Amino acid sequence: MLTIYAPFNNKNSKAWEVFNGVEKSWPDQITKLDNAVETDPVSNSMFWGFVGNNREMVKKLEARNHNYWFTDTPYFGRFDNSNLKPDNHYWRVCKNAIHVPYLKDCKADRFEKFGMKIKAPNFAGKYILVCPSSTGIHNYLDKPNWTNEIIEQIKRYTDRPIKLRHKPRGKGTSGPSEAKVPLSEDLKEAWCVVTSCSIAAVEAMCEGIPVFCDHKSFAVDVGNVELSDIENPYYGGPEPWLYSLAYQQFTPEEIQNGTAVEILMDKEIL
């Protein structure tokens, strides 16, 4: 049995792109409950983002060591509200975590669809670019004061300027479409990016910029976690990691037609 905690009070939520497809393709029997009402989740649950009571329920499942699935925005191929099609945007699918793990030996094919170029690092940047995640993520990490605390920690190890880039928000949504200044612009002279779990880590790595992140970040396998290394950051070739990310995010069409289930089974996630 898979129990989906869904936003019954918002029939226009993009969560339904995931859940309607899961209902058609998932190998388990499905039941749906209201994420704005339920507070005591059962094992083998599925969530979309930290809406309703999702964050509190995910924390309870983790404390009990119970299985759950978490779906949310992708690492690349994010939706465009002005051009929504079932095959032109993606959702990440994670098991027992809010971000995906690093899967070795994934093929390049799914990543190559995005035509993203990867630059070699030149370590010529000037400032530290701090990219906080959302308040909801920081509360999930039990680090509600992450931004102020991380800036104070950075100052212990470097006298480089610090540039703060908050998650863009507006028009009832968040992400690149609402940014007044593109992330690519802020990365041009960045020495490194410091984030908790922001997807900004993907663009930074593709631009050849080292990343510092939280232990629960999807970038932990290619990034740095100790700020004491900020003047001597590690940067490794991100290609295999990017291939892994691409194999753990799916279009609404792929979720509905069984492609997502097939890949998750092949990778022994499902």
Positions of predicted regions on the chain:
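Donor nucleotide-activated moiety binding/catalytic core segment of transferases
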Residues: 33-39, 155, 163-211, 217
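Short, well-ordered secondary-structure micro-motifs within conserved domains or adaptor modules
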Residues: 34-63, 69-72, 190-196
